[in-house]
């Protein structure tokens, strides 16, 4: 297989293709502008097609029903001042942490000057995820960590860009649909 996506300009760098590949044939490589794109190692690729199946650029967009749209405002003015978007992330993640769940989200790594996704089950870790980053985050091996937590029956909250959330959703839908077939 030559490439995962049909059009590189539509690739969001969600890493679903990299994580779903059973042959570890895909690596995420930075372009000149620092954006991560999947590159296939043709020597490892077995043309199974899983990467194309999970790639959201190969999917038709579905309409959003009004019933699936929600509005949040955190009822805590102190926390709202520390948050973005009305504190929805804080409100939802508080419940996850209270239920001994885990949160996956983006932090800005000051030492390496980049945004990365991490896992946390503590308030301080969650607080590091708050605020807007406005750059692509490196999702690394988060998919396997999410999978392990789900297998351990932990409540999981995944946050990221819409493209990253869709990538995670497609990955788990494909993974568990494939296993059941």
Where are the model-predicted features located?
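Conserved small/polar residues in nucleotide/adenosyl-binding loops
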Residues: 176-181
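Flanking helices and flexible, charged tails adjoining ferredoxin-like Fe-S electron-transfer domains
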Residues: 1, 43-152
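Long terminal accessory regions outside catalytic cores
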Residues: 1-13
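Gly/Ser/Thr-rich loops at beta-strand to alpha-helix junctions
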Residues: 85-87, 110, 158-168
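Iron-sulfur cluster-binding cysteine motifs and their immediate structural context
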Residues: 3-4, 16-39, 49-67
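Active-site catalytic pocket residues across diverse enzymes, especially alpha/beta-hydrolases
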Residues: 96, 172-175
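Short active-site oxyanion
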Residues: 153-157
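A short acidic (Asp/Glu
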Residues: 116, 167-171
């Amino acid at each position: 297989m030559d490439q995962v996506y049909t059009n590189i300009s539509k690739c969001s760098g969600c890493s679903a293709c990299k994580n779903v590949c059973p042959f570890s044939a895909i690596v995420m490589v930075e372009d000149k502008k620092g954006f991560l794109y999947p590159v296939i190692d043709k020597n490892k690729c077995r043309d199974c097609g899983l990467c194309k199946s999970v790639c959201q650029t190969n999917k038709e967009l579905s309409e959003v029903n009004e019933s699936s749209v929600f509005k949040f405002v955190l009822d805590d003015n102190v926390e709202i001042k520390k948050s973005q978007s009305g504190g929805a992330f804080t409100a939802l993640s508080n419940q996850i942490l209270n239920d001994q769940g885990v949160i996956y989200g983006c932090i800005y790594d000051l030492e390496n000057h980049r945004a990365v996704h991490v896992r946390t089950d503590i308030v301080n870790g969650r607080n590091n995820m708050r605020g807007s980053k406005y750059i692509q985050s490196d999702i690394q091996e988060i998919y396997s960590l999410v999978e392990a937590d789900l297998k351990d029956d932990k409540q999981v909250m995944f946050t990221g860009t819409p493209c990253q959330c869709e990538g995670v959703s497609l990955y788990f839908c494909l993974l568990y649909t494939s296993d059941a077939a």
